[in-house]
Amino acid sequence: MGRIEKSIEIGAPPEKVWELLALDRLPEWMDVLEMKSGKYISEVHTPKDKYKVGATAHIVEKRWEYDLDISESLENEMITVHSKGKYPYTITCTLKPVDDGTKLMYTSDYESKGILGKAFGKLFAGTLEKQVERALEKLKSILEK
């Protein structure tokens, strides 16, 4: 099991950062996953439904497709999503108000299956961390425009 932990301060209030944590908004900034699209497959009747526990989206990436579901959610404070598929991972984003905006703390736990998967996981851990840093910088850039 691998883990990535990163944080960034964003010059926007937690409510604005929260909006971009919706599963269908991840492709706008999360290049690390090479997402092409994200569409809710659970019922979404109101904007708040996008963040409720049990909400599920189908994600299409460059190399594969899978579903993401929300397992924890506290509006404008914390959200945890879990992937169901070939390469399982869990991402938790925690938001804390700071003087000039929001501190976002990103944690990802991912599983590399099999002997080759574990070997590649160790080799690419640094690359994954850099991709997460780039994604967080892109999120910051979008929100600070």
Predicted regions and their residues:
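Hydrophobic residues positioned within well-ordered beta-strands of beta-sheet architectures
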Residues: 4-6, 55-57, 91, 104-106
